Amino acid sequence: MSQSQRNSDGWTPRTRLGRMVQDGDVTSMEQALNSGLPLKEPELVDQLLPGLDDEVLDINMVQRMTDSGRRVKFRCVVAIGNRNGFLGYAEGRDDQVGSAIQKAIDVAKLNLISVDRGSGSWEDSAGGVNSLTRNAEGKAGSVTVEVMPAPQGLGLAAAETVSNILELAGVEDAWTRSNGNTRTTVNLAKATYNALRNASQSRTPRRAAAKQREQEVSE
């Protein structure tokens, strides 16, 4: 393969969407998400949305019995975002904490969504993006999280895990409500992500029609 087919980081696209990004046919993350093509390459996200922030929400040891004895792995829950409308979430497992975190970050890039932000109140100036445009609800396990629009200046009325995710998404003002075993960080985080993704899908029927985006995020 010629050098011109590689970018400066040595990335060789393996998918149609990746090639479209490299050729300049897709130049923004919004275009990529609305293309109807699946995100399968973390490097694609690095090209279109560099400098994403990440937050490790939970680290847990997971033990499993095998023929060779007890095996221990680390499960890391990670959320990523640009704090301006894009958010991703995933879990990663590995024998080493650092590797588990990196795996989660890479998968979170493939789960990236465009958050449906808005002014949050009719009293706020038109065109604001400090909150959500509508109520958003998501579920994971026994946990249900509802995120509701709020006027500018309220801040985030939310638990720490929920607040961290909303901040990564660029949501500055919101009321939230949660039910179920909210002490389980992984389900609380997943339900929050699912709430924002469900709201995003409701304004993009084409993407919502895709089977992958109809289901709640899974491990």
Curated annotation (Swiss-Prot):
Residues 196-219 are annotated as: Disordered. GO terms for biological process: translation. Keywords: Ribonucleoprotein, Ribosomal protein, RNA-binding, rRNA-binding. It holds the Pfam family Ribosomal_S5. GO terms for molecular function: rRNA binding; structural constituent of ribosome. InterPro entries: Ribosomal_Su5_D2-typ_SF (IPR020568), Ribosomal_uS5 (IPR000851), Ribosomal_uS5_arc (IPR047866), Ribosomal_uS5_C (IPR005324), Ribosomal_uS5_euk/arc (IPR005711), Ribosomal_uS5_N (IPR013810), Ribosomal_uS5_N_CS (IPR018192), Ribsml_uS5_D2-typ_fold_subgr (IPR014721). Residues 52-115 form the S5 DRBM domain. With S4 and S12 plays an important role in translational accuracy. Belongs to the universal ribosomal protein uS5 family. This is Small ribosomal subunit protein uS5.
